[in-house]
Amino acid sequence: MTEQKRKLEKLTGVKGMNDILPQDAGLWEFFEATVKSLLRAYGYQNIRTPIVEHTQLFTRGIGEVTDIVEKEMYSFVDALNGENLTLRPENTAAVVRAAIEHNMLYDGPKRLWYLGPMFRHERPQRGRYRQFHQVGVEALGFAGPDADAEIIMMCQRLWDDLGLTGIKLEINSLGLAEERAAHRVELIKYLEQHVDKLDDDAQRRLYTNPLRVLDTKNPALQEIVRNAPQLIDFLGDVSRAHFDGLQQLLKANNLPFTINPRLVRGLDYYNLTVFEWVTDKLGAQGTVAAGGRYDPLIEQLGGKPTAACGWAMGVERILELLKEEHLVPEQEGVDVYVVHQGDAAREQAFIVAERLRDTGLDVILHCSADGAGASFKSQMKRADASGAAFAVIFGEDEVANGTVSVKPLRGTGAEGEKNVQQSVPVESLTEFLINAMVATAEDGDD
């Protein structure tokens, strides 16, 4: 070690786990506010579960032979007590676990929603990350196709609220367990006839999860998959009536859809209705929301037999679409940036900034970066860059006279003058600023 300090290696974030920086946070806040307003309109209540759960929750709930459980989970052994734990790769199983554990269904069905980070160990690419965010709904205790239709309609309403276009709905029915079992037998027989043409992934799934072979993206297998037995042809009267009821409700609400017999979803807990919202604007990662019915899951995780359905959507993918379609809202600046010169002015500025905040105004008070006072010119540059509507200026003369100078940074002032600096008594500052902001807003509406 020399006398000179060695330069420390710069630390970076984990690949596929991204920072959300201030310039992007406004878009996240816009989306979150929009979706929360929508969910309130449908009577959904927020639930928040831990990001770490017992591994068994996912192996039992999602399915041991799914891609998520086999190769995508971040799992570890707790050094304190030897428990096998996992960073949640999805949240439906966790919400169901919480509902069972806290007896949430004792007094009837529940409409729940969540928003938060999920984790999957996979190759990062556009729209697919190792830490990603999902918003989702879980309608617990609802058995009819009307619940399926409602959660699908929620998605369409969200696209409308966000201004998104070109997102198309695909639906399918996975039927009941006995129907899937009969289809599985015939599907395996069919795929065995083409086993020499199947890729490694399809061969691995052939006897463990053959339904997932139908979801392959390998171009070389598309003809084989296209001619495979379709689960929809194995549906019994109950499953078909449920699927027909869903279609009738979607048509009644003028919501176009396509029946995709190859739509199977990657989680074992689904039955009856499954659906995806897809777009061609995100390349290979075209699914922006997906869900369906999972009636067996609550009993599977230790609860009483209870019907349920829900969906989840990838927040990052939706934000990509908003950027793609130039629907990013302009970030609003604060109301006031307070500038000051001299010790007496700094003290007075501090007091006034707090008083302005008491009235509900958003205020940035200039604070020195190096302990020394910045020049007036430098402070005004920062005020302008902050996006503030007004600069409130304290100098030695203003402090001596009990006044402040107010300079509009956007639009006009209280009297209609554009960017004209005015002297205002300190005791009248709040009223002046409110009137000035009203005038600015009206000027912007003209």
Swiss-Prot record:
Report the catalytic activity. tRNA(His) + L-histidine + ATP = L-histidyl-tRNA(His) + AMP + diphosphate + H(+)
Pfam families hit by this protein: HGTP_anticodon, tRNA-synt_His
Q: Which GO terms describe its molecular function?
A: ATP binding; histidine-tRNA ligase activity
A GO cellular-component term linked to this record = cytoplasm
Q: Which Gene3D superfamilies match?
A: Anticodon-binding domain, Bira Bifunctional Protein, Domain 2
Species of origin reads Burkholderia mallei (strain ATCC 23344)
CDD domains xrefs: HisRS-like_core, HisRS_anticodon
Q: Indicate the quaternary assembly.
A: Homodimer.
InterPro entries reported in the protein's UniProt record: aa-tRNA-synth_II (IPR006195), aa-tRNA-synth_II/BPL/LPL (IPR045864), Anticodon-bd (IPR004154), Anticodon-bd_dom_sf (IPR036621), His-tRNA-ligase (IPR015807), HisRS-like_core (IPR041715), HisRS/HisZ (IPR004516), HisRS_anticodon (IPR033656)
Q: What is this protein called?
A: Histidine--tRNA ligase
